[in-house]
Amino acid sequence: MRRLIGGLLTALVLSGCMVGPDYRKPEIAVPSDFRGATPGAAQDASSFGNVEWWKVFQDEQLQALIRIALEQNYDLRVAATRILQARSQVVIARSFQFPTADLAVAAPYDRQTGGNKTPNYENFFPQGGASVAWELDLWGRFRRATEAARADLLATEDFRRTVILTLISDVARTYFTLRELDLEMEISRSTLATRETFLRLTKAREQGGVATLLDVRQAEQLYFSAAATIADLVRSIEQQENLISILVGKYPEAIPRGRPLTEQALVMAPAVPPGLTSDLLARRPDILQAEQQLVSANARIGEAKALLFPSVVISGFAGAGGAVINGSGFGPFGAFQALPTITLPFFNMGRLSANVDFNDARTQEALLRYQQAIQQAFGEVADSLVGVRQRKAVREQNEATVAAQRDALRLSTMRYEGGVTSFLEVLVTERDLFDAELILAQSWRDEILAIVQLYKALGGGWQTVAPLPAPTATSELPPQDVGPSAAEGRTVPGGDSASVHAGRVSVAEERATNGTGAESGSPAAGGGNDTTWGSVKTFFGRLFSK
């Protein structure tokens, strides 16, 4: 007994060891500033990332659509269920660190009557017991697996934040595209009305002998062209509304409008101060996800290395039983068994070593992907900064173009009315104005979308998350602090899941429902005599009185 206790104490001491590398955050050199950041801007980190960035546009309809999307979008709800799955995986991985216990009860009954050559008999052998098994975590295999599962959970949570950030950006992008199409529709209808007036006047001039039939046909061509543009815009607007409806988790329907596009564009993105690269990129969920995937892969190395060492399993059994033979009770009898088992890997054709190499290579891949995610983030921010700056310049140039084109139309109309030029010059100038106005509308949209992309690239607003769906009884888990390898401030489940008993039907209820009555294996089957059943009750009375 002393040797057994001493062995257990030694095993418990050894269980504090863990093979494999501990995670250390990689030191990655990054630029001190974003390319394209505003030189000399004030250090104000609250400009980005700490606010619900879509509210800077001050469009109540857009904000309402985003709120609905955060509640009903299916991609986001799927991501939330994956978090529940990852939480369960943490509980499963952690459970291997502790002993398992099982209870078993058996009551075999055997009865024979009406025998001619063999004597009649009636036997009942009730027995029950508990078995316990515990694989000691001497080398940290199960703790490494738990560490990896917790990192996977955090990566899943970061993936959900990525979905949130992408969803908000997509809703804003599609909404502003819809408002741009509305602006194009407004321009097209105004142009159609103008061309209708041109056509009517041209027909009147042709009837008066001032204009030619060619002038009429050219005016008709411009009129029908504008009408076709309107028909195509109707299609595009409805398709855009359908896309927004799906994003917010609804069936296709009309989308309410808020502020006009030209008023939206009056809201400019604030200057990006230099020196905020570390703070802002540390909040990008895709970078955090890549790091947690690196943490998980690193922990899997230790899990694989632990398989190279001996494993110790301590199992035991304790129980009691008895017998009732032809009405006579015997027992109860007790039983106890302890069985420590040591398993040492001997020959596996290099499988275990290859498993270590495989996980080491996966860790190297995860490190490269982490570095790549950081580099891509810098590229996206730089692209967004130049996009905001140049889209604004393009929009200003297009405004000047439209102003010049309107004046050109005024002058060409005066020249035509004065008989200096042909009607073709007026039509060409008016057509060029229509095209310039459509291009200006698109430049308004592109400038706003560049602002949206900038906020997305800087990870802005992702911390405003939608609530997880209410977990079921099997997945409602108590939180536990994350180990040192996980991100600070986040929690993962560490307790056992609650079991669900609702909906189960007892054997007696099932038999009553099915109307099957007693069977041959039951003590009540076959009309057993009172002596035997009385002995059974006496046996159980003696058993539970011990």
Question: In which residue ranges do the predicted regions lie?
Answer:
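C-terminal motif of bacterial Sec signal peptides marking the signal peptidase cleavage site
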Residues: 15-16
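Post-signal peptide N-terminal segment of mature Sec-exported envelope proteins
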Residues: 26-44
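Regulatory alphaC helix of protein kinase catalytic domains
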Residues: 38-68
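Small/polar (Gly/Ser/Thr/Ala-rich) solvent-exposed segments
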Residues: 77, 97-122, 133-162, 181-182, ...
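Amphipathic alpha-helical coiled-coil segments
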Residues: 78-93, 163, 167-190, 194-199, ...
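Hydrophobic, lipid-facing positions within transmembrane beta-strands of outer-membrane proteins
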Residues: 124-132, 174, 276, 336-342
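Short, solvent-exposed, mixed-charge loop/turn linkers that connect secondary-structure elements
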Residues: 190-193, 210-212, 231-281, 422, ...
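Acidic, low-complexity, intrinsically disordered peripheral segments
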Residues: 251-252, 266-268, 438-546
